[in-house]
């Protein structure tokens, strides 16, 4: 919807041009800003209103718009990192369908091909997404690292969580071992 996209662009322009009361500096000129994120967990559940490329096209257009105003800061989509392999392929690979089938209208592989998106921002909520600990969770981290590496882009695992506190320490240790590798 062009009207909604216009409103979003007005919001972006206002935000990036906002002057900090204390420093007198526009946000787009601030060294305190690490990057801009287009949205937190954007989704476009696949139905008659949300076709395959809706979110991709939106991210491509809006990230380019942000860069047209502020070419100096990085931009991310803010998506959860869902894939669009299709239901049959997700089942064939024995992957949790909600995160890999394309149901949410997100295609992490494709989003990482956008030139004006500078890094990936996957999230991971193991029990909410039906992941098996020690299997699906580790595959999720590795697959996202491969995707961003292939796109020659960095990755920040922005959010992750596990409801079961008795398993949390061990799981977090496994996840961080993959992320940090031999660095520590």
What does each model-identified segment do?
Residues 29:
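Charged, cofactor-coupling segments
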């Amino acid at each position: 919807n062009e009207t909604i996209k216009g409103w979003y662009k007005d919001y972006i322009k206002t935000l990036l041009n906002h002057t900090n009361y204390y420093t007198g500096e526009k946000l787009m000129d601030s060294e305190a800003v690490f990057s801009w994120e287009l949205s937190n967990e954007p989704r476009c559940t696949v139905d008659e209103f949300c076709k395959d490329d809706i979110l991709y096209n939106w991210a491509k257009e809006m990230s380019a718009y942000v860069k047209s105003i502020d070419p100096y800061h990085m931009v991310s989509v803010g998506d959860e990192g869902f894939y669009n392999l299709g239901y049959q392929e997700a089942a064939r690979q024995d992957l949790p369908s909600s995160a890999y089938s394309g149901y949410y209208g997100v295609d992490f592989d494709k989003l990482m091909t956008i030139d004006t998106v500078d890094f990936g921002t996957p999230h991971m909520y193991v029990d909410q997404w039906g992941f098996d600990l020690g299997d699906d969770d580790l595959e999720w981290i590795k697959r996202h690292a491969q995707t961003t590496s292939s796109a020659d882009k960095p990755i920040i695992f922005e959010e992750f969580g596990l409801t079961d506190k008795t398993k949390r320490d061990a799981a977090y240790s496994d996840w961080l071992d993959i992320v940090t590798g031999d660095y520590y």
